[in-house]
Design a protein with these regions (language model features):
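Solvent-exposed residues in well-ordered beta-strands and their adjoining turns
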Residues: 9-13, 54-58, 69, 94-96, ...
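Amphipathic alpha-helical segments that line or abut small-molecule/effector binding pockets
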Residues: 15-18, 133, 137
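Beta-strand/loop substructures that line and gate deep hydrophobic ligand-binding cavities in soluble
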Residues: 80-133
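Hydrophobic ligand-binding cavity/cleft-lining segments
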Residues: 1-41, 46
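Residue-level detector of alpha-helix boundaries and kinks
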Residues: 2, 12, 53, 78, ...
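Glycine-rich portal/gate segments that line the openings of hydrophobic small-molecule binding cavities
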Residues: 26-28, 38-88, 98-102, 134-145
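Well-ordered beta-strand positions in beta-sheet-rich domains
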Residues: 5-9, 63-65, 88-90, 106
Length: 145
């Protein structure tokens, strides 16, 4: 199991970040590895929403199927990964007294044997950590004037 965590302070209040974050279709605008996002059903927000995200990292391409299992505005959203890569993930927003927000992204991912299994998860975690730090930089830029 790969455990990943990246975090960044964003110069915006949690509610403003949540408003952007809750529009799931926009995640492809700031997530470099997300090539496309498709809703699996009519629901677009909240716990129970299901999505399929085509994820591309270098030559690798997988469809990441996720169900939102927690939706707690403006503090937390969490997913269960049920596609080729399984596990769980969450976004946490912690607003500071100065109005900025610490955004933390945590994941626990299990890779199938044909994607390298546990050794692949270790390598994948290192690569994803770098990619996700870049994602959080792009997300933070959405809130600069």
């Amino acid at each position: 199991v790969a455990r990943l965590e990246v975090s960044r302070v964003i110069a915006a209040p949690a509610a403003r970040i949540w408003d952007d974050l809750s529009r799931l279709e926009t995640h492809v605008e700031w997530m470099a590895e997300a090539a496309s996002l498709t809703f699996l059903g009519e629901q677009r927000t909240g716990a129970g929403t299901r999505i399929a995200v085509v994820t591309k990292l270098g030559p690798f391409r997988v469809t990441d199927v996720m169900e939102f299992v927690a939706w707690e505005p403006p503090r937390r959203m969490a997913v269960r990964h049920t596609g080729l890569v399984t596990g769980s993930g969450e976004f946490l927003l912690d607003e500071a007294a100065d109005g900025s927000t610490r955004f933390t992204w945590r994941e626990r991912l299990r890779f199938p044997w044909y994607l390298g299994g546990p050794p692949g998860a270790l390598v994948g975690a290192r690569i994803l950590t770098v990619v996700w730090r870049g994602n959080l930089r792009r997300l933070a830029r959405r809130f600069t004037s």
